[in-house]
Structure formats: structure tokens, C-alpha cells
């Protein structure tokens, strides 16, 4: 059986591992260049055994089946009733079974309750995590965080640890 998994985060990796263990041929497609999903941008502990998201992602990657194909930097554009997936770049993949493991994302930047067009220097928490934890870009400060939920508090803690003034609203 050919299984197509859309999404290379924790759920996609677990699905690939399980399917390969049952003798299935597996392809995992993800829009990012690396497996791991949102875990890759999570530098805070809390993923079991006091591991960060990145450390947890690394442990998942170690268990990613060598026989599974990973197709990075690719988006599934459409899935046909004939069980053909059309991918960005013009490629097509036939499959017997489809697993959607696309995870979740925060509210799109344009949907945030900020008046006017989005000026430079305003980011979502996810964008900020990606900038800081994946690309090493540190805000010059001071930083104002709109929202004091879990992610806002995590970001405030991370920014304050760098001695950058931070305010939660």
C-alpha cells in the first residue's frame, strides 16, 4: 500500500513510523525544508523529560524510517478522487491511502486585531519564535506582546531572559 502523509511534524513522523513498520511504502510531504513541524521553533521546555521542542523533534527524527521518502519544501496543491496528489513544482504522486497530519497554526497575521496595514516590526508569536529560534534573529527591544496566553507568556519569558524589556498587554 502506498501511503501519502501530508505534514512532517510529530504526527506525520509517527504515522510514517507506524506505516513503515507494517510494510507500507510511505512518502511524507512538508512545506518546510526539515521534518519536525512547529516543534523546531519551540525553545521552551515542556516536551517530556524537560526537553525543548527542538530536542523532542531531534529524537523523533532519529526514529524516522529510512525507507520512507521525505519531500521537503513542497505543498500539496490538490488531491484528486483518482488518488493522485498534485504537488507544487508540477510533480504528481499516486497513493492508496492519504493521512493528513498538517497540525495547526496560529491566527493568520492579517486577522489579528491591529488597526491599519501591518507595519514593520509587528509579528505573530509563531513568526517571532521562528525568527529567534530557527534564524537567530533577536529583537532589538523593547518588545510589546499582545495577549498573555501560553504562547505570549513563553515568548515574554524567552525575551526577558535576553535582558530585553518586554510588556504583556
Predicted regions and their residues:
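FAD-binding core/adjacent interface of flavoenzyme oxidoreductases
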Residues: 1-6, 57-142
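Beta1-alpha1 glycine-rich phosphate/pyrophosphate-binding loop at the start
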Residues: 2-59, 140-169
Amino acid at each position: 500500500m502506498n501511503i501519502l502523509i501530508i505534514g512532517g511534524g510529530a504526527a506525520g513522523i509517527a504515522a510514517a513510523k507506524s506505516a513503515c513498520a507494517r510494510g507500507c511504502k510511505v512518502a511524507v510531504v512538508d512545506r518546510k525544508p526539515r521534518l519536525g513541524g512547529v516543534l523546531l521553533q519551540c525553545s521552551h521546555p515542556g516536551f517530556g523529560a524537560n526537553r525543548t521542542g527542538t530536542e523532542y523533534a531531534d529524537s523523533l527524527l532519529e526514529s524516522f524510517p529510512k525507507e520512507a521518502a521525505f519531500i521537503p519544501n513542497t505543498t500539496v496543491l490538490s488531491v484528486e478522487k483518482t488518488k493522485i496528489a498534485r504537488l507544487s513544482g508540477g510533480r504528481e504522486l499516486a497513493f492508496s491511502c492519504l493521512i493528513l497530519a498538517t497540525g495547526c497554526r496560529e491566527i493568520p497575521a492579517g486577522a489579528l486585531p491591529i488597526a491599519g496595514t501591518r507595519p514593520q516590526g509587528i509579528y505573530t508569536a509563531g513568526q517571532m519564535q521562528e525568527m529567534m529560534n530557527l534564524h537567530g534573529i533577536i529583537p532589538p527591544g523593547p518588545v510589546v506582546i499582545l495577549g498573555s496566553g501560553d504562547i505570549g507568556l513563553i515568548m515574554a519569558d524567552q525575551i526577558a531572559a535576553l535582558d530585553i524589556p518586554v510588556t504583556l498587554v
